């Protein structure tokens, strides 16, 4: 006799019974993301988690039932930017009864103080608490609270991407690790993201395989310091394992600390064509004296040794960097050394900012405490930044102009903002506006493009 129990059938509705009510429409969540690629990835994970609980992503805050502000605390005025955005969403809360939550690094930094300062924020949570977001949303319907505790590394669970949400996209972020164990004098990340925790390599590889199965062709492995990855293998080994995933054509990663750049990683750039010829290697300053105060654990000569080994291993590699100008005690000679390094390295791009003291950092504590820690006047720092940016614009323009007439491979990501154009990137991560329609250049396709125009920060071309 079969063990199967037949399913009972619901009786047919009698004549005149009311029709069943339609399913309630999904609630909507709007996410305002500030800052880095880690935050972009975290925002996607939050939307995916809520999607399993009947939430859909809203196109604007005006139609949202839940507004999430995922914040960044790396630069100055982070708190002011958050408060300005919160002010704009206050009316939506009053009109729709929407919940408002603040996550990310400012949330981790401010904790309960943010709830006291902004009475219409319903809850605050730090990066370690993302996996609990659905239950926090329900809890917020009855109370205001802050969840900013750290999880032990053994307990931490990396939110896994929903591959189906990436269907139709050419690229995706994959989290390899979180946190940072370095204590750079200017950086708040160890205070807002916690200690380093590496994701086990089988999980990283499995997520890349799932993404490849729905059409993703490029993955970017992300973490605050991926060079120190330790999820059961080295970072160089992890790159090789991801490169073996069928369907993944391109691999990128960010961010790296020069001190942790290994010879094995350089060899991956030499040997593995799927690892793209682009490396973001933040230097911060061209002065050894400033680097020592920054606690960067390398000299300019050591940085350039790693830089030159990358260039030798992968000729034509595009190397980008970060600079901080006006760090406490920076002299004219220190700044000129940064300019000289920029000219020598000819970075593809540099993300450069005036120093701003961040809470709890060594630089904030020691600012003004000794002659070598004296603040640089704001007007002096701004003038230095303008000179550095001008030099970088010139160098970037020269690099892009050298691409004119060349045929390059472009991975198409989707439509451009301009009608009749598609948007994509070269292996070196240069943005290309391609004159073509979707049929000729669908998302995920790698197409040959002849470069016909070089702008200040991007290229344009036609199918070759």
From Swiss-Prot:
Q: Which UniProt keywords apply?
A: 4Fe-4S, Cytoplasm, Iron, Iron-sulfur, Metal-binding, S-adenosyl-L-methionine, Transferase, tRNA processing
- Keyword flag Metal-binding: yes
Q: Which residues form the Radical SAM core domain?
A: 166-398
Q: Where is this region: Disordered?
A: 1-25
Domain TRAM, by residue range, is 401-464
> Subcellular localization, per the record?
Cytoplasm
Q: Which reaction does it catalyse?
A: N(6)-dimethylallyladenosine(37) in tRNA + (sulfur carrier)-SH + AH2 + 2 S-adenosyl-L-methionine = 2-methylsulfanyl-N(6)-dimethylallyladenosine(37) in tRNA + (sulfur carrier)-H + 5'-deoxyadenosine + L-methionine + A + S-adenosyl-L-homocysteine + 2 H(+)
Enzyme Commission number(s) of this protein: 2.8.4.3
Residue positions annotated to bind [4Fe-4S] cluster 2 are 180, 184, 187
Residues noted as binding [4Fe-4S] cluster 1 in the record, renumbered to the chain: 36, 72, 105
Q: What CDD domains does this protein map onto?
A: Radical_SAM (cd01335)
The record's annotation in SMART domains points to: Elp3
> A single Gene Ontology molecular function, please?
N6-isopentenyladenosine methylthiotransferase activity
Q: Mind telling me which InterPro entries this protein's record contains?
A: Elp3/MiaA/NifB-like_rSAM, Methylthiotransferase, Methylthiotransferase_N, Methylthiotransferase_N_sf, MiaB_methiolase, rSAM, rSAM_horseshoe, TRAM_dom
Name the cofactor(s): [4Fe-4S] cluster
Where does the MTTase N-terminal domain lie? 27-142
Matches recorded under Pfam families: Radical_SAM (PF04055), TRAM (PF01938), UPF0004 (PF00919)
Task: Tell me a GO cellular component.
Answer: cytosol
Q: What class of enzyme is it?
A: transferase
Q: What does this protein do?
A: Catalyzes the methylthiolation of N6-(dimethylallyl)adenosine (i(6)A), leading to the formation of 2-methylthio-N6-(dimethylallyl)adenosine (ms(2)i(6)A) at position 37 in tRNAs that read codons beginning with uridine.
Q: Subunit structure of this entry?
A: Monomer.
- Matches recorded under NCBIfam families: miaB-methiolase, MiaB/RimO family radical SAM methylthiotransferase
Q: Which family does it belong to?
A: Belongs to the methylthiotransferase family. MiaB subfamily.
State the HAMAP family in the record: tRNA_metthiotr_MiaB
Q: What is this protein called in UniProt?
A: tRNA-2-methylthio-N(6)-dimethylallyladenosine synthase
Species of origin: Anaeromyxobacter dehalogenans (strain 2CP-C)
């Amino acid at each position: 006799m079969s063990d199967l129990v037949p399913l009972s059938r619901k009786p047919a509705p009698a004549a005149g019974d009311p029709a069943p009510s339609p399913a309630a429409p999904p609630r909507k969540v709007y996410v305002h993301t500030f800052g880095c690629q880690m935050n972009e990835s975290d925002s996607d994970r939050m939307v995916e988690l809520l999607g399993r609980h009947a939430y859909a992503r809203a196109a604007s805050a005006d139609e949202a039932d839940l507004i999430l502000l995922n914040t960044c605390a790396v630069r100055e005025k982070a708190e002011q930017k958050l408060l300005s955005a919160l002010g704009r969403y206050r009316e939506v809360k009053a009109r729709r009864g929407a919940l408002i939550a603040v996550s990310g690094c400012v949330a981790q930094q401010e904790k309960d103080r943010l709830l006291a300062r902004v009475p219409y924020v319903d809850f605050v949570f730090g990066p370690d608490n993302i996996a609990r977001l659905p239950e926090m949303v329900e809890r917020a319907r009855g109370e205001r609270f802050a969840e900013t505790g750290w999880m032990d590394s053994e307990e931490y669970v990396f939110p896994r991407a929903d591959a189906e949400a990436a269907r139709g996209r050419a690229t995706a972020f994959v989290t390899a690790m979180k946190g940072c164990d370095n204590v750079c004098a200017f950086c708040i990340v160890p205070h807002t993201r916690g200690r380093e925790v590496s994701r086990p390599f089988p999980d990283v590889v499995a997520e890349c395989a799932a993404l490849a199965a729905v059409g993703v062709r490029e993955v970017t492995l992300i973490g605050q310091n991926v060079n120190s990855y330790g999820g059961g293998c080295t970072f160089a080994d992890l790159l090789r394992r991801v490169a073996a995933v069928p369907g993944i054509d391109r691999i990128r990663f960010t961010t790296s600390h020069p001190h942790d750049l290994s010879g094995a990683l350089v060899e991956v750039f030499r040997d593995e064509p799927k690892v793209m010829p682009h490396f973001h290697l933040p230097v911060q300053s061209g002065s050894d004296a400033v680097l020592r105060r920054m606690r960067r654990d390398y000299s300019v000569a050591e940085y350039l040794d790693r830089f030159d080994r990358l260039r030798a291993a992968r000729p034509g590699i595009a190397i980008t960097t970060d600079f901080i100008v006006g760090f406490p005690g920076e002299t004219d000679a220190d700044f000129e050394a940064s300019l000289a390094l920029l000219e020598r390295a000819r970075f593809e791009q540099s993300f450069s900012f005036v120093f701003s003291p961040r809470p709890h950092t060594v630089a904030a504590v020691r600012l003004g405490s000794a002659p070598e820690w004296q603040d640089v006047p704001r007007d002096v720092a701004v003038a230095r930044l303008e000179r550095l940016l001008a030099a970088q614009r010139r160098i970037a323009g020269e690099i892009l102009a050298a691409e004119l007439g060349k045929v390059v491979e472009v991975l198409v990501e989707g439509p451009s903002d301009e009608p009749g154009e598609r948007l994509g990137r070269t292996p070196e991560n240069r943005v290309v506006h391609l004159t073509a329609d979707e049929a000729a250049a669908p998302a995920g396709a790698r197409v040959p493009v002849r470069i016909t125009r070089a702008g200040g920060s991007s290229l344009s071309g036609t199918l070759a």
